[in-house]
C-alpha cells in the first residue's frame, strides 16, 4: 500500500487580473503547470476514526491546517453519503520543502494530495469531479491539484481547461520573504482591467504576471531576485509571490545559473510537467 504521496509545486506561467466582482474576489486568467518538485505527505491509515497530523506547522494550529481540514472534509462528506468505511482515520506527516507564502501552491497542493490519497486509501469511491468540488471549498487553487493536469484557469481560478504547454526547466528562487495573498490583491495600484483573451491568443503572447509590479514595489527582496534572474533568462513572479522563476530549455543551462545564485537566494531547479507527480504515481 502506497504511504508516500507527492504534493507538487505549481507555477503560474502567466497571470492576468481581468476584473473584480462585487464580493471582492478578482477574476483572472492564468496558466498552471506543475513542477517535479514539492512536499511529500506520509499517510498511514488508522482504524479508530482519528485524524492526527504528526508534524505541526509553525504558526498554524493543527485544526486550521489545510491538511487536517481536507481530511475532515472528506471524512464528513463520505460519511454523509454512506461511502466511508467504519473507523477510517489517518496519521499524516509532511516533509515540507515548499515555502509558506511563496506562490508555489504548497498549502493547496497539500490539501489536494490528502483528498486524493485518503479517497484512495479509505476506498470511498468519490469521483475526481466530487473531490475537485470539495477542494474548491478549501481554496481556489485546490481543484487544479486534484485534477492533476496543467490547466488554463478563468473565473476566480475555478474554471479549468486542460492544456499542454511546453515542459521547460525552471530555476525557482525564494527571496526570503513571505507575501500574504491579500497584500497584493488589496493594493489599490494592482492592475484590475487586463482585457480577457482566448487561450490560443494568450499562449502566443509573451507571458507576464499582473501581480509582479506590486510585489516588486512593496518587497525589495522580490525586486532584487527578479533583477538578478533577468540577467540570465526570461523571468517572472509566480502567483502573488514571493517566489520568482526563470525558464530554460535544458536542465544544464538552469543548473549553470543556479551555481551562480547569490547566498541570500534560496533556489532550486525543477522540470515543468503537465501531469502532476501525484497522479503519475497513481497510474
From Swiss-Prot:
An annotated GO BP: isopentenyl diphosphate biosynthetic process, methylerythritol 4-phosphate pathway
Enzyme Commission number: 2.7.1.148
Binding site for ATP: 99-109
Residues annotated as catalytic: 10, 141
Pathway connected to this protein: Isoprenoid biosynthesis; isopentenyl diphosphate biosynthesis via DXP pathway; isopentenyl diphosphate from 1-deoxy-D-xylulose 5-phosphate: step 3/6
Catalysed reaction equations from the record: 4-CDP-2-C-methyl-D-erythritol + ATP = 4-CDP-2-C-methyl-D-erythritol 2-phosphate + ADP + H(+)
UniProt xrefs under Pfam families: GHMP_kinases_C (PF08544), GHMP_kinases_N (PF00288)
A single MF term (Gene Ontology): ATP binding
Broad class of enzyme this protein falls into: transferase
Keyword Membrane assigned: no
Keywords: ATP-binding, Isoprene biosynthesis, Kinase, Nucleotide-binding, Transferase
Gene3D superfamilies tied to this protein: 3.30.230.10, GHMP kinase, C-terminal domain
Highest taxon listed in the record's lineage: Bacteria
Matches recorded under InterPro entries: GHMP_kinase_C_dom, GHMP_kinase_C_sf, GHMP_kinase_N_dom, IspE, Ribosomal_Su5_D2-typ_SF, Ribsml_uS5_D2-typ_fold_subgr
Annotated family: Belongs to the GHMP kinase family. IspE subfamily.
HAMAP family membership: IspE
Function in brief: Catalyzes the phosphorylation of the position 2 hydroxy group of 4-diphosphocytidyl-2C-methyl-D-erythritol.
Subunit structure: Homodimer.
The protein's name in its UniProt record: 4-diphosphocytidyl-2-C-methyl-D-erythritol kinase
Protein encoded by which gene: ispE
Amino acid at each position: 500500500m502506497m504511504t508516500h504521496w507527492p504534493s507538487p509545486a505549481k507555477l503560474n506561467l502567466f497571470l492576468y487580473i481581468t476584473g473584480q466582482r462585487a464580493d471582492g474576489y478578482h477574476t483572472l486568467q492564468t496558466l498552471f503547470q506543475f513542477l517535479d518538485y514539492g512536499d511529500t505527505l506520509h499517510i498511514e491509515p488508522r482504524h479508530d476514526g482519528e485524524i492526527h497530523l504528526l508534524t505541526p506547522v509553525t504558526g498554524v494550529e493543527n485544526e486550521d491546517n489545510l491538511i487536517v481540514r481536507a481530511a475532515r472534509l472528506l471524512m464528513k462528506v463520505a460519511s454523509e453519503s454512506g461511502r466511508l468505511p467504519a473507523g477510517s482515520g489517518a496519521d499524516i506527516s509532511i516533509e515540507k520543502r515548499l515555502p509558506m507564502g511563496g506562490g508555489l501552491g504548497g498549502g493547496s497542493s497539500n490539501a489536494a494530495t490528502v483528498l486524493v490519497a485518503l479517497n484512495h486509501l479509505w476506498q470511498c469511491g468519490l469521483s475526481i469531479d466530487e473531490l475537485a468540488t470539495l477542494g474548491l471549498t478549501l481554496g481556489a487553487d485546490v481543484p487544479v491539484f486534484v485534477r492533476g493536469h496543467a490547466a488554463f484557469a478563468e473565473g476566480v481560478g475555478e474554471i479549468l481547461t486542460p492544456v499542454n504547454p511546453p515542459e521547460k526547466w525552471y530555476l525557482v528562487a525564494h527571496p526570503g520573504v513571505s507575501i500574504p495573498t491579500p497584500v497584493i490583491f488589496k493594493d489599490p495600484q494592482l492592475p484590475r482591467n487586463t482585457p480577457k483573451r482566448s487561450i490560443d491568443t494568450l499562449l502566443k503572447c509573451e507571458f507576464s504576471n499582473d501581480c509582479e509590479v506590486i510585489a516588486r514595489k512593496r518587497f525589495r527582496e522580490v525586486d532584487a531576485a527578479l533583477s538578478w534572474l533577468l540577467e540570465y533568462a526570461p523571468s517572472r513572479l509566480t502567483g502573488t509571490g514571493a517566489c520568482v522563476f526563470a525558464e530554460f530549455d535544458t536542465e544544464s543551462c538552469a543548473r549553470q545559473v543556479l551555481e551562480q545564485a547569490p547566498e541570500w537566494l534560496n533556489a532550486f531547479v525543477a522540470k515543468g510537467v503537465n501531469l502532476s507527480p501525484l497522479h503519475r504515481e497513481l497510474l
